[in-house]
């Protein structure tokens, strides 16, 4: 059994890591950290984990210097990971970072969109943790930068089109997200009366996930990305509508074949040739469902993707990356059916 640690295990992504790892047969969670909750048993903070035999002796610690594991998940805020990750690296541990701190090779982009001065990248192999595009790099990495939730759904929605160079470089993404994507701390924006029966667009041209989407798509081909997110009155999920514009004369059947070939061996990407993906199909799972593939009379090709923002958009993808790094079956601890309805 491999021992793993979770730094920042009180938030939604930390809790989701614990939920998913409870069923993982090849790892044990030996350390969970929180300065605020230090000394408390895990189920005192996460009551839904009470009775899990694997966690019967698991308590929070406030001292990250005591953490010793094969791999560390850092579920910490943007800007905080870069303060602690180098120490874990120096001590020989593998790290999967769920913040945005290591997603950019060009640190000027990080500093521009996150408004944080970066402290530099450690001198180790770093991989962007989207397995469908970077599996070989992930296998060799000591540090994996887990992708953002919006970028995961957006990139997977159009990667085959960009790779095959059948669309114009202009790509427009419209995403609806659940409130859990804003984190565990309530704000005026996420307050129930402001979210309920409402749709709230935000950062309509300046969201920090825009350059992350664009830089990854540019590794496949041409891309100029526009992205607008909307906060929806749901707990989990991201539904992304990708508006692309055909540069070649291809029909719907040819496009579907391109997707089926591109993702043919990917266990967590499901292509729907007829149905339009729905959030309830992926809720609680590590799947990314892709469908739509409709072309209008002006040559606009619309593709829809659906993910659970806390699973494929965060903790599930982190565990998928861990499985790859350790040489486990990628499905280990993750292959579950969606909560529908």
Curated annotation (Swiss-Prot):
Top-level class of the enzyme under EC nomenclature: oxidoreductase
Tree of life domain: Archaea
Catalytically driven reaction(s): N-acetyl-L-glutamate 5-semialdehyde + phosphate + NADP(+) = N-acetyl-L-glutamyl 5-phosphate + NADPH + H(+)
InterPro entries in alphabetical order: AGPR_AS, AGPR_type-1, NAD(P)-bd_dom_sf, NAGSA_dehydrogenase, Semialdehyde_DH_NAD-bd
Signal peptide from the UniProt entry: none
GO biological process: one example: L-arginine biosynthetic process
Protein name: N-acetyl-gamma-glutamyl-phosphate reductase
Pathway listed: Amino-acid biosynthesis; L-arginine biosynthesis; N(2)-acetyl-L-ornithine from L-glutamate: step 3/4
Biological source species: Methanocaldococcus jannaschii (strain ATCC 43067 / DSM 2661 / JAL-1 / JCM 10045 / NBRC 100440)
Function: Catalyzes the NADPH-dependent reduction of N-acetyl-5-glutamyl phosphate to yield N-acetyl-L-glutamate 5-semialdehyde.
Keyword presence, Oxidoreductase: yes
